[in-house]
Design a protein with these regions (language model features):
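C-terminal regulatory/interaction module of P-loop NTP-utilizing enzymes
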Residues: 1-277
Length: 277
């Protein structure tokens, strides 16, 4: 459909990894723009190489006599200098940022605009031309367009911390990724940490799934499940027990208030995980 993909879902479900995996699968360069409050065109699109412009201006100043030699009157002098003014605002003096880099990739690329919900609404407006026409307009130069045969594959991710504008959503296909169910999460752990015994894998996934049902400040993401699996392997764990779980809660819970809230439930959750079929 030749459209960007907006991927939404809770933090840690693999939205960013999806874009990276597409780049790896297609053997394309992945250009990433990490969004944040206050992000503007100088960090996302382009800025001028002011140091280089200043250096060339100094060189021009030192050779001014040679340049203006033979000029008759002010009009001819201005005309000669005008040619150099245009040079200073050419692509040679342009420092491309992620969005412009993606357009200039002749072989195509994957452009990952990560956590768009952390940026301002004003930045969303800057993206609209890029998302709809795969081009960017620079006042001093003109419009720079992507190779029509190898346009960048654009992925935007959002953790839904704020509402994305309708204008941006209209330009994108939408994909929502929820937390995986137990079967899928078990497959993910098996793929990422294959040395985990099957029974331990079932227990830790069951425990994590139960944790996500609790009222926590931040529930464990898939990355925390994988980190916990690696930790349990390092501790030579064969089966979960409540004391071991308490000692390793800091691997899967990132806030002390969550650790304190869960500590009293560990025995019950561990029993549920170890006795589940």
């Amino acid at each position: 459909l030749d459209k960007p993909v907006l991927i939404e879902g809770p933090p840690g479900v693999g939205k960013t990894e999806l874009a990276k995996s597409v780049a790896n699968m297609l053997a394309l360069n992945c250009i990433r723009l990490q969004c944040y409050e206050g992000l503007d065109e100088s960090k996302a699109i382009y800025e001028w190489k002011y140091g280089k412009q200043l250096l060339y201006t100094q060189v021009l100043k030192e050779t001014l006599g040679e340049i203006l030699e033979g000029a008759k009157g002010l009009t001819e002098s201005v005309a000669k200098l005008h040619e150099f003014g245009d040079v200073f605002f050419s692509e040679d003096f342009l420092e491309p940022r992620p969005l412009l880099k993606a357009l200039k990739e002749e072989a195509g690329c994957v452009l990952l605009i990560d956590e768009i919900d952390k940026s301002d609404h004003e930045f969303e407006s800057l993206l609209l031309e890029m998302l709809s026409d795969y081009q960017l307009s620079i006042p001093e130069i003109g419009t720079i367009k992507a190779n029509p045969d190898r346009k960048p594959l654009v992925f935007l991710t959002s953790n839904n911390t704020r509402e994305i504008s309708d204008a941006l959503k209209r330009r994108c296909l939408h994909l929502y990724i929820p937390f995986p169910d137990a079967d899928l999460e078990s497959q993910i752990v098996k793929a990422r940490v294959p040395e985990v015994p099957e029974e331990l894998r079932r227990q830790l996934v069951t425990f994590i799934q139960a944790l996500r049902e609790l009222d926590l400040k931040k529930v464990p993401a898939i990355s925390e499940t994988i980190d916990w699996a690696k930790t349990l392997i390092l501790l030579h764990t064969e089966s979960l027990d409540s004391e071991l779980v308490k000692q390793t809660l800091n691997v899967i819970l990132k806030f002390q208030e969550d650790i304190e809230a869960v500590t009293g439930e560990v025995q019950m959750l561990t029993n549920k995980a170890t006795k589940a079929p």
